[in-house]
C-alpha cells in the first residue's frame, strides 16, 4: 500500500471530496516551495491529478512529470514510469513505446496507472489483472469504475454493473451519482430491470438538484427499465420527462425518442411510434442511423406493413458498418417473402445465411420452398434452422413447428422425429395459440402410428 507523506493528507482529502481546485492549488505550492522530496511527490501527484482529466489534462500532466524528473532519481521509479506510460497510451502511442516503461511493482498506485495504460492500448484482460486493492480514496473508486468500463467492453454486463456499484460505494456526490447511472445501464444490458431500478433510486438520492442533462439520462434509463419489466405506460411517462429535460438542456440524444417509440409500440400505438422513430432518425448520427432503421423495419413488419418494412430494411442493408447486418438481411427476406416476392426473398435469405444469420435465413428459405410445394427442400431448410437456432428463440420455435408440419405433409414420414420435435416445442406455445392445437394433433397421430408399428413413406 502507498503511504503518502503526512503533508499530502490534506491534498488527498480534497481529492476524495472532489475539490480539485483546492488540491491543485495546494500541490502547486508544495511543488514550487517545498523541500526536494515533498516537491517531487507533489509534482507526481499533480501529474496524476491532471491525468484524471483525460486528454484535456495531457499537457499539464506532462509538464508536471518533467518537473518531477528534473529533481532527479526518477529514471527507474515505477510510479513515474507508469504515469508516463499512461499519458503516452492516452496520446495513442504504439505499444512498443508504452510497454517498456512498465517495471514490476506490487504498489497499487503504480498498478492502477499501468492498468489505465493497458486499457488505452486495448489490452483489456491484462488491464483487469493489473488492478489491486489498497489505493488512496481518490483512486479506489476510479479503479472500480475502470473495472466497470473494461467489463462493459468485454460484454460482461452483470459484472460491470457490480463494479460500478462498488465504485459508487467509495465515491461521493456527483461521482457516486454517475457511477450508479452506469451501473443501471449495465443492469439493463444484462436484462435485470429490477436491479436497474434500485440503482436509479440510489442515484436520485445521491444528489440534490440534478443537472437537466443528467436528469434526462436517469429518466431515459428508468423508461428502459420499465419497458424491460413490461410496463410500457410507466416507460412512456418516464421517457417523456426525459424528452422535456432534453429540450431544457439542449442535448438531444437519438435514443430518447427511440425508447418513446418502443413504449408506444407496446401500447399498440403504431402511427405515434413511427413518428417517434422518425424523430430518432432525424437526431441520429451516421453510426446511430442503422439502429433506428432496423427498429422501424421490424416495427412495420410486425404491423403487417410489409412495403414500408422493405423500404426501411433496404436502407439499412446499405449500411455496411452495421454489426447486425446479417439479421437485417434476414428481416428484409421476410418482408419480401410476405409480399410473395419469392425470388428476391430467397436472394436476401441466402445473403443472411452467408453473413451468419443462419437460423433466420434458413427459416425464410424453408417458407419459400414450402409455398412452392418443394417439400423435401423445405424440410432440409427447416431442419438447418432448428439446429442453428437457440432453443426457445422465435426462429427455433418456428423451425420446429414447420419441420413437424412438413413431415405431416409428407405422409407422416419419420414419426419419431415428429413426436420428439413436437414435444420439445409445445411447452413454448400458449395453449390458445393455433399452433398448439395443430402440433398436439400431429404428435398424437404420429404416436398412434408408432404404436401401430407403421413407418409410412
Sequence positions of predicted segments:
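Start-of-helix register in tetratricopeptide repeats
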Residues: 5, 41, 76-79, 109, ...
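Alpha-helical segment of the N-proximal tetratricopeptide repeat
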Residues: 6-29, 33, 51-52, 109, ...
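"A position-specific structural signal for the A-helix of alpha-solenoid helical repeats
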Residues: 9, 45, 83, 113, ...
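Residue-level detector of the short coil/turn that links helix A to helix B
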Residues: 18, 54-56, 92, 122, ...
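Single-residue signature of alpha-solenoid repeat helices
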Residues: 23, 61, 97-98, 127, ...
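Hydrophobic/aromatic packing residues within the alpha-helices of TPR/SEL1-like helical repeat arrays
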Residues: 27, 65, 99-102, 131, ...
Amino acid at each position: 500500500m502507498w503511504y503518502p507523506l503526512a503533508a499530502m493528507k490534506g491534498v488527498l482529502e480534497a481529492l476524495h471530496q472532489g475539490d480539485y481546485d483546492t488540491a491543485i492549488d495546494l500541490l502547486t505550492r508544495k511543488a514550487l516551495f517545498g523541500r526536494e522530496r515533498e516537491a517531487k511527490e507533489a509534482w507526481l501527484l499533480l501529474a496524476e491529478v491532471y491525468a484524471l482529466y483525460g486528454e484535456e489534462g495531457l499537457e499539464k500532466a506532462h509538464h508536471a512529470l518533467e518537473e518531477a524528473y528534473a529533481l532527479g532519481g526518477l529514471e527507474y521509479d515505477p510510479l513515474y514510469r507508469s504515469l508516463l506510460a499512461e499519458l503516452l497510451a492516452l496520446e495513442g502511442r504504439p505499444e512498443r513505446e508504452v510497454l517498456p516503461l512498465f517495471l514490476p511493482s506490487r504498489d497499487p498506485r503504480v498498478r492502477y496507472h499501468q492498468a489505465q495504460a493497458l486499457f488505452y492500448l486495448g489490452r483489456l484482460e491484462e488491464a483487469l489483472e493489473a488492478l489491486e486493492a489498497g489505493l488512496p480514496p481518490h483512486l479506489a473508486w476510479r479503479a472500480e469504475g475502470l473495472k466497470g468500463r473494461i467489463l462493459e467492453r468485454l460484454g460482461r454486463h452483470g459484472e460491470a454493473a457490480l463494479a460500478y456499484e462498488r465504485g459508487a460505494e467509495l465515491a461521493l456526490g456527483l461521482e457516486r451519482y454517475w457511477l450508479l447511472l452506469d451501473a443501471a445501464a449495465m443492469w439493463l444490458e444484462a436484462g435485470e430491470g429490477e436491479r436497474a431500478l434500485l440503482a436509479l433510486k440510489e442515484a436520485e438520492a445521491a444528489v440534490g438538484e440534478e443537472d437537466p442533462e443528467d436528469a434526462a439520462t436517469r429518466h431515459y434509463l428508468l423508461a428502459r427499465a420499465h419497458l424491460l419489466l413490461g410496463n410500457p405506460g410507466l416507460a412512456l411517462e418516464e421517457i417523456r420527462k426525459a424528452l422535456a429535460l432534453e429540450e431544457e438542456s439542449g442535448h438531444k440524444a437519438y435514443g430518447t425518442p427511440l425508447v418513446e417509440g418502443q413504449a408506444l409500440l407496446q401500447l399498440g400505438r403504431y402511427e405515434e411510434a413511427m413518428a417517434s422513430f422518425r424523430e430518432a432518425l432525424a437526431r441520429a448520427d451516421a453510426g446511430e442511423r442503422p439502429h433506428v432503421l432496423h427498429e422501424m423495419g421490424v416495427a412495420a413488419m410486425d404491423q403487417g406493413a410489409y412495403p414500408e418494412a422493405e423500404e426501411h430494411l433496404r436502407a439499412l442493408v446499405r449500411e455496411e458498418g452495421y454489426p447486425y447486418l446479417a439479421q437485417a438481411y434476414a428481416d428484409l427476406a421476410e418482408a419480401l417473402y410476405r409480399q410473395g416476392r419469392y425470388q428476391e426473398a430467397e436472394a436476401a435469405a441466402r445473403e443472411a445465411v452467408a453473413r451468419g444469420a443462419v437460423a433466420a435465413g434458413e427459416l425464410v428459405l424453408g417458407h419459400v420452398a414450402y409455398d412452392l410445394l418443394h417439400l423435401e427442400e423445405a424440410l432440409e431448410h427447416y431442419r438447418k434452422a432448428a439446429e442453428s437456432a437457440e432453443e426457445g428463440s422465435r426462429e427455433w420455435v418456428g423451425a420446429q413447428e414447420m419441420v413437424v408440419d412438413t413431415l405431416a405433409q409428407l405422409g407422416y414420414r419419420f414419426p419419431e422425429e415428429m413426436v420428439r420435435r413436437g414435444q420439445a416445442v409445445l411447452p413454448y406455445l400458449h395453449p390458445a395459440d393455433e399452433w398448439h392445437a395443430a402440433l398436439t394433433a400431429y404428435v398424437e397421430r404420429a404416436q398412434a402410428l408408432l404404436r401401430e408399428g407403421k413407418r409410412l413413406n
